[in-house]
């Protein structure tokens, strides 16, 4: 629009006023409406200065002004409308400049309308279906909270006692699961879980004639190491010792809940053999699960006296003869062997039928020869010197200087004699202590 209006304006100027171009004054002022309308005054001045044809120039200027006004009115109007359109576009782009031009009353009315629109918008948001979605969620949550207490009462332990008060899930018709494939029922007087069949679940046989008992230490008030009571159970669902007949070697085993210990009691009176008859009534069931060893009685003194020679006769080269007491070592017997032989030789001068008569004398001589050492080698050397004088003479006659080096069989014979003498001394020491 602006380019069209400017083109029309220039065409009208060139067609309506050709004389203005001749003067040169309007050549630099083309395209300016206000300068073209105001320029007649300097033109009049120029005409007066020249002094030539001044009234003619004035008439011509008036005519030209009238024609200019007639021809310029339309393009000027179109130009004004273009500027107004351009200003409207600027107002849309920059609202702050528009507010500065708008009067205060109009501005207040606009604010009031905006406030009302905001209020209506808030009301629509409150009543909108998108906002109303929160209300059914709240209702659902409250409805879910009403069922929470029932779900919280479900037992976490499957093997615990199932009380009918806590089962609020609607599955009371199904008995609680114990974890091992057996259904349990609740006995309110005991407070524990008992088998559905009292007779079948009373006792499970363990290794023949033994009985197994399930005992709750919290109800009885007994410790884990104490034997629970066998009578007085309420409900009759627990096994007692008197229900089943027990054999001679039977033992009761009780499994205590809450502990890993097994307490048991054995009737020694009913055990086969002599051990059952030797147990006192006070010592029965006193071990509380511990193992007691009952050793046989010590043999009589006649057996000790008669058995000592049998032991000495059967003792080998490397075997140690066992005494009846079993407490004294062989080294202690060797250290005291000399004193024992002296006392026995004084007490029992006629003893020694099973042995040679020179054995005791050899011990006395060995004490004189080996006074500094009581070891096994010293005693063996003493036996070699004094045990067989006839053999020593023969060996000296045969070999001469080689008599000291004897073969091994002779050494074995000497050690056997020494062992027999030591065993006899140990047997005699046991006899003396027994007397």
From Swiss-Prot:
Record field: compositional bias (Low complexity): 422-435
Q: Reproduce the UniProt comment on modification after translation.
A: Phosphorylated on serine residues in the ASARM motif; the phosphorylation is important for the inhibition of bone mineralization. Cleaved by CTSB/cathepsin B; the cleavage is blocked by metalloprotease PHEX.
- Which InterPro entries does the UniProt record give? MEPE
Residue ranges under compositional bias (Polar residues)? 337-346
Tissues with expression: Expressed in osteoblasts and osteocytes.
Region (Dentonin) location: 164-186
Q: What induces it?
A: Induced by dexamethasone.
Q: Name one GO cellular component term.
A: extracellular matrix
Q: Check the record and name the Pfam families matching this protein.
A: Osteoregulin
Tell where it localizes: Secreted, Extracellular space, Extracellular matrix; Secreted
Does the record's keyword annotation contain Secreted?
A: yes
Q: What is this protein called?
A: Matrix extracellular phosphoglycoprotein
Question: Coding gene?
Answer: Mepe
């Amino acid at each position: 629009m602006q380019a069209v209006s400017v083109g029309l304006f220039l065409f009208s100027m060139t067609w309506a006023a050709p004389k203005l171009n001749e003067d040169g004054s309007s050549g630099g002022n083309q395209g300016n409406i206000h300068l073209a309308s105001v320029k007649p005054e300097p033109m009049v001045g120029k005409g007066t200065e020249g002094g030539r044809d001044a009234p003619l120039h004035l008439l011509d200027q008036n005519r030209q002004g009238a024609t200019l006004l007639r021809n310029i009115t339309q393009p000027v109007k179109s130009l004004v409308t273009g500027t107004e359109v351009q200003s409207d576009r600027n107002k849309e782009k920059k609202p702050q400049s528009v507010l500065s031009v708008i009067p205060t009353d109009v501005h207040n009315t606009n604010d009031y309308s905006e406030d009302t629109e905001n209020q209506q918008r808030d009301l629509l948001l409150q009543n909108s279906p998108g906002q109303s979605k929160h209300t059914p969620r709240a209702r659902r949550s409250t409805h879910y909270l009403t069922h929470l207490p029932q779900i919280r009462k479900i037992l976490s332990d499957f093997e615990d006692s199932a009380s009918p008060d806590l089962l609020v899930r609607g599955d009371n018709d199904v008995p609680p699961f114990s974890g091992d494939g057996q259904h349990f029922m609740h006995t309110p007087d005991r407070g524990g879980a008992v088998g559905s069949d009292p007779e079948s679940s009373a006792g499970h046989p363990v290794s023949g004639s033994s009985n197994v008992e399930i005992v709750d230490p919290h109800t009885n008030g007994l410790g884990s190491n104490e034997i629970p009571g066998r009578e007085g159970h309420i409900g009759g669902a627990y096994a007692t010792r008197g229900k089943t007949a027990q054999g001679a070697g039977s033992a009761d085993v009780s499994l205590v809940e809450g502990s890993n210990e097994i307490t048991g009691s054995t009737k020694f009176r009913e055990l086969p053999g002599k051990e059952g008859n030797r147990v006192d009534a006070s010592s029965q069931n006193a071990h509380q699960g511990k193992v007691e060893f009952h050793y046989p009685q010590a043999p009589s003194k006649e057996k000790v006296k008669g058995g000592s020679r049998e032991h000495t006769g059967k003792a080998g080269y490397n075997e140690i003869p066992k005494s009846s007491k079993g407490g004294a070592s062989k080294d202690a017997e060797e250290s005291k062997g000399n004193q024992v032989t002296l006392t026995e030789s004084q007490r029992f001068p006629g003893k020694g039928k099973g042995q040679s008569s020179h054995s005791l004398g050899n011990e006395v001589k060995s004490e004189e020869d080996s006074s500094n050492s009581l070891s096994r080698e010293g005693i063996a050397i003493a036996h070699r010197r004094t045990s067989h004088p006839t053999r020593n003479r023969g060996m000296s006659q045969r070999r001469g200087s080689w008599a000291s080096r004897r073969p091994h069989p002779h050494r074995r014979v000497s050690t056997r004699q020494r062992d027999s003498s030591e065993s006899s001394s140990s047997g005699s020491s046991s006899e003396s202590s027994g007397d």
